[in-house]
Amino acid sequence: MADSLPTEFDVVIVGTGLPESILAAACSRSGQRVLHVDSKSYYGGNWASFSFSGLLSWLKDYQQICIDGEESTVKWPDLIHETEEAITLRKKDETIQHMEIFCYVSQDLDDNVEEIGALQKNLSTVASSTLTEPLDSACLVKDKRSVYVTKYKMPAKDTLKSDRETSLEVNDIEETLEKENDCGDKTRVHTDGDKDEKPVEDNMDQPKRNRITYSQILKEGRRFNIDLVSKLLYSQGLLIDLLIKSNVSRYAEFKNVTRILTFWEGKVEQVPCSRADVFNSKELTMVEKRMLMKFFTFCTDFEQHPDEYEAFKQRPFSDYLKTKKLTPSLQHFVLHSIAMTSESSCTTIDGLKATKNFLQCLGWFGNTPFLFPLYGQGEISQCFCRMCAVFGGIYCLRRKVQCLVVDKESGRCNAVIDHLGQRIHAKNFIVEDSYLSEETCSSVQYKQISRAVLITDQSILKTDSDQQISVLIVPPVEPGTFAVRVTELCSSTMTCMKDTYLVHLTCSSSKTAREDLESVVKKLFTPYAEIEINKEEHSKPRLLWALYFNMRDSSGISRSSYNGLPSNVYVCSGPDCGVGNEHAVKQAETLFREIFPSEEFCPSPPNPEDIILDGNDKQPEVPGTKNVLMAEVEP
Amino acid sequence: MSMEDYDFLFKIVLIGNAGVGKTCLVRRFTQGLFPPGQGATIGVDFMIKTVEINGEKVKLQIWDTAGQERFRSITQSYYRSANALILTYDITCEESFRCLPEWLREIEQYASNKVITVLVGNKIDLAERREVSQQRAEEFSEAQDMYYLETSAKESDNVEKLFLDLACRLISEARQNTLVNNVSSPLPGEGKSISYLTCCNFN
Ligand SMILES: Cc1cc2nc3c(=O)[nH]c(=O)nc-3n(C[C@H](O)[C@H](O)[C@H](O)COP(=O)(O)OP(=O)(O)OC[C@H]3O[C@@H](n4cnc5c(N)ncnc54)[C@H](O)[C@@H]3O)c2cc1C
Ligand SMILES: Nc1nc2c(ncn2[C@@H]2O[C@H](COP(=O)(O)OP(=O)(O)O)[C@@H](O)[C@H]2O)c(=O)[nH]1
Ligand SMILES: [Mg+2]
């Protein structure tokens, strides 16, 4: 593996987040020689997804004090010529702050946990009571990191046994079978006759609560794919368009978000967002149903009826809704869950547009306007990286760039020097914001994103199916704070272990993540306790584990805010706070057009199935076999 | 999908150190040739070959690493919906054998646990330069519960056998699966693929 990097490229890209990865694919696709590096050992930067143990390692890395260029064999100053100057890059990522971890489940030691690549149990020493103190972040650093288990198991179907009863899966969506899950369909049958198999719970009104321990979470840790940034794909959004157009979609699979929820009068309710939903809703009265239908019908072609909203055009959408004979709860639905706007900021015209957009996004893939990528958001940037590699791009994780080398005379950057002291030449350089030094960013004003990641035992709105993917917007309570977006993922999204839910909370920061989000967490969940004390709390899902952190939001920073960057160095931002990925796609496309004005942005690659293979034993491919569903078996 | 002229479709993924002959194995099998010189085939994501096994058409979609293994930077998504993995090393290169545990760790982490893994020792035409004995490899593969085969992409030794045996095994696994589940279980693509086709089906 002592393979050294080639040293001549057209484009060097530093950082593997979504915008950089889209750009990498676009550049490589248009014939540029691309080198794509990341200083981390994983893809995605702040767009990454981690297994549970991976997330713990990530947290630990952030808490370590910067080890100053330990690995650099040759320091850059020795490698810079007289005619050049260097712009140093940051040694340590500083985009994550205020991390706080809470573990509510018991950390019993009887289970012999053995997870490959995992930090072992007793990682953190949190009390398993309801009285949880924030884990002092220094705690994690002190923890002993046990040796990796170096025994390799054959990934055979029966290595792990389903150790819980299987709950009934009454499901109205087609593909909720968890094929890959150990506790999934196949193993389920295998264990049917097992003695320890408890009877199947058939009373859905009183869902059985499983006792889940920390060691179980660790053991099943690879079932988790925990997104650092929680996003969804609009079914008619730019990212879906790009994925389809570029054929990158073949590397990923998606599920529909199944429900849009709302928090109204202290209760979580489902928002009826399609005509069918409105009809079938049990929460709505006949009168409400009629009002909502009428309003939806109007919204789908509101431009045709200017007289109906002209007077309100620039006034708040919330005021306008009051005039539309909608009950307060319906107004709330439309404002927060459908238009997804916050009370004060949205004008009527924008609200109508958003509502229309929402209605148009419905029904393309399912009942809500959103899709979620299986295995998490982190897959998406990797898919673009694969496309880049397929067209010859070279990939190198764990490669740190010490500095950009600028030619004094031309003022252009002509190379980078990596941590091994290797000089790599290129014509253009794309660098993600978090790699730029404090000096370069000294006049930049960053926003922050507040994030929480929760592992829970039940859905915030229980129904027949335990495999729902839900989005809930909780409006701000106090002025000056922001609406909180809650995304609840079930295990069939391949992001959490069976019998748990992975819940992401996201908002623009006004304080630390915990300060911003804890009140919403408390409204929706109750801490896990072995014995139920409070009957009233019984119906709420229980919190097994929680993490809070703040992430820097470098979106929307104008290029001129960065000091002293040569004109052929382009900057990509980290994740923004919005639901969709439009910002990343727009940024990638804008930069691509700036660098290569005459090139097409991510055109469709030739279909591998159309590449007719030479040789005598070839089987002619039948035309019309495009758009094959990946790896589908048709018995 | 009903128009497709095959009975089964499987995704097979190759992994192993750079230079062990993965690309050559794929091209030998799908194109029947041993490419002169090195260099990946730019723009080719995967190769397809349809084979007939006991009267059934089996379409094999064979994915190569796109060179990302060179600096240990394979994307996890590469493993995601593979039905089978071909883990390759070079019998004339001890190092490529010693790296196998690392590859197995990746498989364990990212591949489905129903994936079938085959260990392949390639370049047996260079027997005089062998560094890894057959016995060592057999012991290793047994311990890991993998199938094992030695091949030469150059001389076309065992290459057909490798893929055809794998196809047979995949068919019987898939059969077992559908029997047990009593539903037509798509394997392993549990999600939706998005394409224009899907879009047009709605509304
Ligand atoms: C069905 C539906 C589809 C939507 N589709 C998209 C979409 O494809 N892309 C999207 O970004 N937002 C879309 N929105 C709007 C989006 O949900 C919210 O406006 C946005 O998430 C508000 O977040 P914010 O207040 O945190 O961000 P803001 O600070 O209000 O905006 C964040 C960024 O998003 C951009 N943006 C906001 N609204 C839109 C929009 N409608 N279209 C394009 N860009 C917008 C802005 O330019 C801004 O840079 C859609 C809304 C609905 C209901
Ligand atoms: N002698 C011999 N050389 C081989 C064989 N297979 C591949 N090679 C050579 O090994 C080198 C690397 O092969 P390649 O398929 O590119 O390896 P990859 O990096 O694993 O895809 C090339 O020079 C091939 O010609 C083989 O079976 N026998
Ligand atoms: Mg190759």
From Swiss-Prot, chain B:
Q: What is its EC number?
A: 3.6.5.2
Record text on activity regulation: Regulated by guanine nucleotide exchange factors (GEFs) which promote the exchange of bound GDP for free GTP. Regulated by GTPase activating proteins (GAPs) which increase the GTP hydrolysis activity. Inhibited by GDP dissociation inhibitors (GDIs).
Give the EC class as a word.
hydrolase
- Lipid-binding residues (covalent, S-geranylgeranyl cysteine): C199, C200
Among Gene3D superfamilies, the record links this protein to: P-loop containing nucleotide triphosphate hydrolases
Question: Which co-factor is required?
Answer: Mg(2+)
Quick one: where's region Switch-II?
A: 67-83
Q: What is its main location?
A: membrane
Q: Name one Pfam family in it.
A: Ras
Sample GO molecular function, one term: GTPase activity
Do you know which PROSITE patterns this protein is assigned to?
RAB
Q: Which residues carry this modification: Cysteine methyl ester?
A: C200
Catalytic activity, reaction form: GTP + H2O = GDP + phosphate + H(+)
Q: Which InterPro entries match?
A: P-loop_NTPase, Rab, Rab30, Small_GTP-bd, Small_GTPase
The terms describing its cellular component in GO are: cis-Golgi network; Golgi cisterna; Golgi membrane; Golgi stack; intracellular membrane-bounded organelle; trans-Golgi network
Q: Can you name this protein? A: Ras-related protein Rab-30
**Species of provenance:** Homo sapiens (Human)
Its gene name is: RAB30
